[in-house]
């Protein structure tokens, strides 16, 4: 069974349709990713001056950091058409061919989750990216023949959260690789303040700070929290969102000061109380929480590891001193061998 949607999930949710209005429309409006923005601005200006298609661009980074938004901005700044799709949607080579043959000169084709393209589709994409040609096999058996179709010179913008899953031939064909990083609290404050202005709701500096601190370094989460806090402010007939309103709303939503939600705290508390802080294997945790293993590894643990609350050791999951302080619990004395580098992790 699919786990319920979490308020602090960086993945796109069905109720995120409202964040379209919050997205910046130009590079000058885009907050954060300063080096990436500066480089993109130069590459776009150079391509525009030469009247050429921009080199293919690859955005790499965790979900919710603005890869799709930046792809749209690239097309808008170039003044060209924009077509969007995703790796899992392009099931056959013919699906990709249909997309490519409908592109105009210098258009931008955006493929999200590009690491999920099938090998057969990738083979068709290589000559399209390199030579702007489609090399298709028509027919079967002895009657099969190769047909080359010239394409308009286009820009492929790929986005991936899993750069390690990209094949080397595909990765090497992107002339402009750009890595997006988590945002600072100050950058998220700017995003929240701008979002409040777009939504027509008042926002104090400390209110923006309170939302930004709990947004896990991710604009998508910041926008989602902002919309829910706005609901609390409207219900209270407040003129503006201040720290008190933001704290009340986010506490009601069970998002604490570190951005952890009820599931995060349940995970940490289970290890602390039931297993003495660890180490404990992931299969044991899956049984204890009644959650599938992949949900624990892909949804719950990454942020806890990033924040320094959790370690993955060869012997299992282990809480750090930081985690016990956050939970307000005394850290038990643990044998140094629990931090050992040898042996295999219990049912990991």
Curated annotation (Swiss-Prot):
The residues listed in the UniProt record as binding Mg(2+), with positions renumbered to this chain, are 68
For region Head domain (RuvB-H), the annotated ranges are 257-348
Q: Where in the cell is it found?
A: Cytoplasm
Entry GO CC: cytoplasm; Holliday junction resolvase complex
List residues binding ATP. Answer: 22-23, 64, 67-69, 130-132, 173, 183, 220
Output the SMART domains linked to this UniProt entry: AAA
> Which parts of this chain are annotated as the region Disordered?
1-20
Q: Which GO terms describe its molecular function?
A: ATP binding; ATP hydrolysis activity; four-way junction DNA binding; four-way junction helicase activity
Instruction: Tell me the GO BP annotations in alphabetical order.
Output: DNA recombination; DNA repair
Catalysed reactions listed for this entry: ATP + H2O = ADP + phosphate + H(+)
In short, the EC number is 3.6.4.-
Keyword Repeat listed: no
> Which residues does DNA bind?
293, 312, 317
Residues of the region (Small ATPAse domain (RuvB-S)) are 184-254
Q: Check the record and name the SUPFAM superfamilies matching this protein.
A: P-loop containing nucleoside triphosphate hydrolases, Winged helix' DNA-binding domain
Q: What's said on domains? A: Has 3 domains, the large (RuvB-L) and small ATPase (RuvB-S) domains and the C-terminal head (RuvB-H) domain. The head domain binds DNA, while the ATPase domains jointly bind ATP, ADP or are empty depending on the state of the subunit in the translocation cycle. During a single DNA translocation step the structure of each domain remains the same, but their relative positions change.
Report the function annotation for this chain. The RuvA-RuvB-RuvC complex processes Holliday junction (HJ) DNA during genetic recombination and DNA repair, while the RuvA-RuvB complex plays an important role in the rescue of blocked DNA replication forks via replication fork reversal (RFR). RuvA specifically binds to HJ cruciform DNA, conferring on it an open structure. The RuvB hexamer acts as an ATP-dependent pump, pulling dsDNA into and through the RuvAB complex. RuvB forms 2 homohexamers on either side of HJ DNA bound by 1 or 2 RuvA tetramers; 4 subunits per hexamer contact DNA at a time.
Q: Which family does it belong to?
A: Belongs to the RuvB family.
Q: How does it assemble?
A: Homohexamer. Forms an RuvA(8)-RuvB(12)-Holliday junction (HJ) complex. HJ DNA is sandwiched between 2 RuvA tetramers; dsDNA enters through RuvA and exits via RuvB. An RuvB hexamer assembles on each DNA strand where it exits the tetramer. Each RuvB hexamer is contacted by two RuvA subunits (via domain III) on 2 adjacent RuvB subunits; this complex drives branch migration. In the full resolvosome a probable DNA-RuvA(4)-RuvB(12)-RuvC(2) complex forms which resolves the HJ.
What name has this protein been given in UniProt? Holliday junction branch migration complex subunit RuvB
Organism per entry: Bradyrhizobium sp. (strain BTAi1 / ATCC BAA-1182)
């Amino acid at each position: 069974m699919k786990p319920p949607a979490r308020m602090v999930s960086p993945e796109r949710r069905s109720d995120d349709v409202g964040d379209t209005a919050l997205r910046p429309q130009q590079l000058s409006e885009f907050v954060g990713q300063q080096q990436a923005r500066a480089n993109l601005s130069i590459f776009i200006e150079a391509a525009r001056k030469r009247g050429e298609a921009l080199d293919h661009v690859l955005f790499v980074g965790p979900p919710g950091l603005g890869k799709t938004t930046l792809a749209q901005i690239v097309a808008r700044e170039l003044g060209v058409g924009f077509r969007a799709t995703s790796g899992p949607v392009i099931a056959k080579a013919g699906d990709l061919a249909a997309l490519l043959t409908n592109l105009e000169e210098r258009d931008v084709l955006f493929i999200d989750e590009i690491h999920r393209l099938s090998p057969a589709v990738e083979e068709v994409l290589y000559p399209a990216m390199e030579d702007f040609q489609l090399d298709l096999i028509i027919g079967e058996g002895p009657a099969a023949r190769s047909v080359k179709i010239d394409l308009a010179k286009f820009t492929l913008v790929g986005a991936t959260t899993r750069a390690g899953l990209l094949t080397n031939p595909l990765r090497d064909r992107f002339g402009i690789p750009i890595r997006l990083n988590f945002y600072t609290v100050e950058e998220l404050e700017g995003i929240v303040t701008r979002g409040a202005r777009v939504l027509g709701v008042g926002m104090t500096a400390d209110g923006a700070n309170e939302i930004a601190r709990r947004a896990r370094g991710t604009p998508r989460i910041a926008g989602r929290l902002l919309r829910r806090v706005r609901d609390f402010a409207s219900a209270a007939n407040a003129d503006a969102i201040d720290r008190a309103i933001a704290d009340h709303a986010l506490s009601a939503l069970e998002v604490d000061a570190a951005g952890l939600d009820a599931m995060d705290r349940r995970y940490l508390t289970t290890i602390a109380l039931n297993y003495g802080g660890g180490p404990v294997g992931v299969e044991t945790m899956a049984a204890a929480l009644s959650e599938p293993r992949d949900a624990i590894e892909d949804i719950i643990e990454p942020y806890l590891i990033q924040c320094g609350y959790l370690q993955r050791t060869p012997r299992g999951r282990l809480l750090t001193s930081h985690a016990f302080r956050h939970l307000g619990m005394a850290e038990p004395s643990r044998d140094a061998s629990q931090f050992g580098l040898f042996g295999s992790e219990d049912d990991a």
